[in-house]
């Protein structure tokens, strides 16, 4: 990806946030990385400066809690179980799209 506006992180984040119920995304160690010193090896999640560095891309997503099912209407007991499959598919689409984009 383009390391400024169309970085790999921003394109993945944009696509992941399109999934209903997603509230956050972090790459690599996420906010735990702020606790490391400069000499420690950070786990950056396979992305450096917005471009894939060849390591596996890893991220964590936060999903909002399931709404109460006490009311009337249609409810999912837990839609969070479907999120990993959808997130994997969305990630594959973003990576495939980037692989077809001319450099």
Where are the predicted features?
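Internal helix-turn-beta structural module
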Residues: 57-103
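Glycine-rich anion/phosphate-binding loop at the beta-strand->alpha-helix junction
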Residues: 1-71
């Amino acid at each position: 990806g383009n390391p400024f506006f169309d970085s790999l992180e921003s394109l993945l984040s944009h696509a992941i946030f399109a999934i209903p119920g997603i509230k956050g995304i972090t790459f690599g160690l996420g906010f735990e990385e702020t606790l490391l010193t400069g000499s420690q090896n950070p786990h950056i999640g396979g992305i450096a400066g917005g471009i894939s560095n060849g390591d596996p891309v890893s991220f964590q997503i936060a999903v909002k809690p399931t709404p109460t099912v006490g009311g009337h209407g249609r409810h999912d007991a837990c839609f969070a179980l479907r999120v990993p499959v959808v997130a994997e598919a969305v990630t594959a689409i973003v990576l495939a799209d980037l692989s077809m984009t001319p450099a």
